[in-house]
UniProtKB/Swiss-Prot annotation:
Belongs to the bacterial ribosomal protein bL27 family. It is found in: Plastid, Chloroplast. Disruption phenotype: Embryonic lethality. Embryo development arrested at the globular stage. Part of the 50S ribosomal subunit. This is Large ribosomal subunit protein bL27c. PANTHER family: LARGE RIBOSOMAL SUBUNIT PROTEIN BL27M, RIBOSOMAL PROTEIN L27. It comes from the Eukaryota. One of its GO terms (cellular component) is chloroplast stroma.
Amino acid sequence: MAMATSMSLNLIGAFKGLSLSSTSSFLRGDLSFSPKTSFTVTLPLENLQAPIPLTIESAHKKGAGSTKNGRDSPGQRLGVKIYGDQVAKPGAIIVRQRGTKFHAGKNVGIGKDHTIFSLIDGLVKFEKFGPDRKKISVYPREIVPENPNSYRARKRENFRLQREKKKARRENYSYTLPTPELVLASASVDDAEANPEC
């Protein structure tokens, strides 16, 4: 019995902040170690208060929900910027892409992020490049003189004449259309005698 009390005092001294409940069979002197007996340990509440607030962190990516993160990120603004048969200036970006969906053709360069850009001033053409590839080229623009008899040219001239008439009416003087004058070329009599017709 003396051994049990000294053992309990040693335990109480070792666990200074802990207290064994009075319902414990150990303090009452019951030394039967059966599976039915249980120890209950109570801790004082003032020692349980944490000095800093606790933060709960997940140890694994899955626990943190990384599969749900990053879904609302903005797009990368990829795609075709200048389409076929449109004018491109030197240095103009034609396509921004990941990898080479489009390959570089004539008069275009390719950047380290596979951006295709124009090297000259001209028209952009999208061409087939093999069975399953596409190539982008820029060809110099050939300026074709406009046909003066085309519908667009006649319309432009008609509107120009209307503007001139309206301007003349505002300035209070009559506007007369310039009439085409027939100019006849006449040769002097001396030249006609010197060069007789045969």
